[in-house]
């Protein structure tokens, strides 16, 4: 079972990825992890990627595709794999198809931007312990203070509203077009495309996923 998971940052992809991995015994392949592993293992592609990254440049699509092919040929991918954070763009999706990497399911977790902003910009963290709160969903007993120590809570830079909106803008510009792309591929019968409402409970989304993936 070869799966691509699409959805904006904060849509809840990580939680559902975990569910899919445990349920179907397939590994999650994230390009970041894959790059680090290839560099560490010193494979020819890994060494090439290291050279590019050390020079402060972006790793090319061709190189990433090579790494994906190398990774999915490994033993733990026999039953399939879950691609996370790749492809991000239509040229990458085209390159995958040209390289014969077939996908059985494309899953989109859809959450409106305003809901994502509410989810992410409402997070508060106690830096000393890593305890996480949410002003709406899981508020501290005293506003702005950690329940245990009474110390101040802070907002992670990644959770600042301006940062969240910027990341959402990049997602809509680069990755959202993949939804239409895979919609067409599905219409041609070359994959299955399903969209899930990510504002539902985690359990509900997991149940719906399971009914599609069985």
UniProtKB/Swiss-Prot annotation:
It comes from the Bacteria. ATP binds at residues 10-15, 123, 132-133, 200. The keyword Nucleotide-binding applies. Its EC number is 2.7.4.3. Pathway: Purine metabolism; AMP biosynthesis via salvage pathway; AMP from ADP: step 1/1. Coiled coil: none annotated. It is an enzyme of class 2 (transferase). Keywords: ATP-binding, Cytoplasm, Kinase, Nucleotide biosynthesis, Nucleotide-binding, Transferase. AMP binds at residues 31, 36, 57-59, 85-88, 92, 156, 167. The keyword Cell wall biogenesis/degradation does not apply. Residues 30-59 are annotated as: NMP. Pfam families: ADK, ADK_lid. Its main location: cytoplasm. Belongs to the adenylate kinase family. Catalyzes the reversible transfer of the terminal phosphate group between ATP and AMP. Plays an important role in cellular energy homeostasis and in adenine nucleotide metabolism. This is Adenylate kinase. The gene is adk.
């Amino acid at each position: 079972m070869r799966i691509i998971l699409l959805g904006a940052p904060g849509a809840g992809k990580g939680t559902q990825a975990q569910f899919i991995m445990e349920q179907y015994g397939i590994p999650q392949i994230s390009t970041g992890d894959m790059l680090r592993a290839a560099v560490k293992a010193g494979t020819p592609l890994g060494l090439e990627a290291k050279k590019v990254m050390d020079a402060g440049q972006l790793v090319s699509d061709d190189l990433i595709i090579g790494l994906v092919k190398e990774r999915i040929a490994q033993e733990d991918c026999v039953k399939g794999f879950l691609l996370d954070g790749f492809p991000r763009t239509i040229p990458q999706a085209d390159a995958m198809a040209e390289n014969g990497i077939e996908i059985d399911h494309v899953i989109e977790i859809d959450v409106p931007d305003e809901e994502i902003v509410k989810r992410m910009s409402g997070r508060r963290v106690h830096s000393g312990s890593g305890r996480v709160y949410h002003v709406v969903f899981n508020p501290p007993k005293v506003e702005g203070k950690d329940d245990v120590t009474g110390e101040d809570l802070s907002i992670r830079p990644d959770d600042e509203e301006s940062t969240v909106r910027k990341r959402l803008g990049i997602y809509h510009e680069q990755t959202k077009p993949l939804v239409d792309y895979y919609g067409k591929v599905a219409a041609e019968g070359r994959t299955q495309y399903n969209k899930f409402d990510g504002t539902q409970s985690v359990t509900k989304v997991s149940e719906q996923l399971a009914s599609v993936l069985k």
